[in-house]
Amino acid sequence: MSGLRVYSTSVTGSREIKSQQSEVTRILDGKRIQYQLVDISQDNALRDEMRALAGNPKATPPQIVNGDQYCGDYELFVEAVEQNTLQEFLKLA
């Protein structure tokens, strides 16, 4: 797969995950950065793919990937936004 992907889930009981996913997509939309939303709740293979790319068998959404390069999770995303290094974080620069 190519391009920027945000792994998320439409099925979660966690308010924290819902909030984090929402913030990531809101920021990307606000900056007009194109991405594909990948819903891991639809297929266990997608969850396994997300975890393999993250290098963490317990990784939870949101996770951000560009092509086959892992960018990071929510905390790293927010840090990049705060430090004005989002383009580099997303491997777009």
From Swiss-Prot:
SUPFAM superfamilies to which the protein is assigned, alphabetical: Thioredoxin-like
Pfam families: SH3BGR
A GO biological process held by the record: cytoskeleton organization
Coiled coil: none
N-acetylserine modification, residue list: S2
Post-translational modification: May be glycosylated.
Keywords attached to this entry: Acetylation, Cell membrane, Cell projection, Cytoplasm, Glycoprotein, Membrane, Nucleus
Annotated tissue distribution: Ubiquitous. Expressed in heart, kidney and liver (at protein level). Expressed in brain, lung, spleen and skeletal muscle.
Subunit structure: Homodimer. Interacts with MYO1C (via its IQ motifs); the interaction is dependent on calcium and takes place at membrane ruffles.
PANTHER family attached to this UniProt entry: SH3 DOMAIN-BINDING GLUTAMIC ACID-RICH-LIKE PROTEIN (PTHR12232), SH3 DOMAIN-BINDING GLUTAMIC ACID-RICH-LIKE PROTEIN 3 (PTHR12232:SF3)
Job of this protein: Could act as a modulator of glutaredoxin biological activity. May play a role in cytoskeleton organization.
Name the UniProt record assigns to this protein: SH3 domain-binding glutamic acid-rich-like protein 3
Source lineage: Eukaryota, Metazoa, Chordata, Craniata, Vertebrata
This protein's encoding gene: SH3BGRL3
